Amino acid sequence: LSGIEKPQAGSLISFNYQATGGPLENHDTLSCTVYLYEDYLWRMDDVTLIRVEKNQWKGTYQLSDNCALFALSFLAGEMWNRIIDNNDENGGYVFTTLDTQGKMLPGGYLGWGTFRKPSCFHIGNYFQKFDIQDEAVEMWTTKEMEHYAANLPKFVDIYMNMVALRMGEKNKKAVDFLFQKINKEFAVTEFIYATFENIYRFKLQDKEKADSIKAIVLKQYPNGFTARAQMFHQIEAMPLGEERLTQTEGFFKKYPYEDCVNDRFSKQ
C-alpha cells in the first residue's frame, strides 16, 4: 500500500494497492472496506477500487473533518470464502490523521491504542494476529487524557476497560474511586451512568449498586437510551399477540426509528 503519508482530516486520500506477492494476487475483483474513528465512534464504509494493472489497484476516499483514525482492509471472494489482506501481522493499514495545525485529532491517540488491541477491545474484527502490549494501550490512553481529558465523558467506557487491564476487572476500589471522581469533575451523562452500571452489574457482580445507578438513570433520563432498551426488551419478552403488537406500535411512536438510528449511543 502506498500513497498515504500524513493524511489530514477532511481531505481526500488517494492510495495505490499492489497485490503482487500477497494473498490477493491475481484476483480479478477486489473490494475495500475503511474503518473510521470519528468523535470517539467507529463506523465502516466501502471504498471503490479501480484496477490500474493486473495486480495494481487505486482508490480514493473523502475523510470527514472529525476523522481521527482510519484503517483499510482489502478483500476478495464471497462472504463464505473471503480472502482478506489488511497487513495483519505487521500492524495493519492503519493511519492517524492530523488537523490543519499538524496536531492529532480528539480520539487519535485513543484509537491508535485500542484498535490495535483486539484481545481487549474487539473493534471490527480487523486484526486476527496483531495485538499490542497492555502497557502500550495504557500509554496511548494516557496521551489521550493528556491532550483531551475534557472528552472523557465520550470515551469513559474505553477508559474503564484500560483501568481493568491495569488494575484487574475485580478491583472494586478502583471502580468506586473513579465513579466518584468522574461524578465530581464532569457533568455526568446517561452514557457515564450506563457504563458504570454495566461494570457493577456484569464485572463486579454488584447487583445492588447497579440497580441503584439504573434507577437514577431512569429517573433522570425517562426517554433516554436505557429506558428505550428496557421497554424494547419488555416487549420482546411478551408472547405473540395483539397486546405485543399494540406495545410495539407504541414503542415506535415514542422512539421513532430514525431517531434511534441517529442516536450516537445506539452505535456504542
Model regions and ranges:
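Glycan-association/targeting regions that enable binding to alpha-glucans and other polysaccharides
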Residues: 1-236, 241-268
